[in-house]
Amino acid sequence: RALPSPAFRERAMSVNDRLKSLGITLPPVAVPAAAYVPFVRSGNLVFISGHIARRDGKPWVGQLGRDMDTATGKQAARAIAIDLMGTLQAAVGDLEKVTRIVKVMSLVNSTPDFTEQHLVTNGCSELLAEVFGDKGAHARSAFGVAQIPLGACVEIELIAEVA
């Protein structure tokens, strides 16, 4: 009798099992830095406010194309994905309720000549796909901006559909 294929086993894993296999522990919801809430649920959609990149609990500052390269920006976007999932879990109680990551919007603090915002944002998109499987495939926008609050290098917001 043949063993299930790796692709089948991957589909059979729960979101929490995937997080555990990746060594990811989701953080608590960060306290907003201004007059807004971390998330809003409207019907079966959850809108998660922009999360900035953090390192060691402090804003991960820098500008892509000046003092940060694409690979480092991608790491920052991946770190944001972990924070976004922590907020999403707080919003719905269990990530198994997520039926689809609908949209990701990324703002990349970058110099005028930096053109790899899409590659930076892949740090978030790739992790969401790894954790949620097919449900993690999403629409996306990635923008280069002159500055982000607190000097952060990347800010990302997310919309998810939940059961």
Spans of features found by a protein language model:
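Short, Lys/Arg-enriched N-terminal segments with co-localized hydrophobic residues
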Residues: 1-12
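Short, polar/acidic, helix-capping and beta-turn segments at strand->helix junctions
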Residues: 13-163
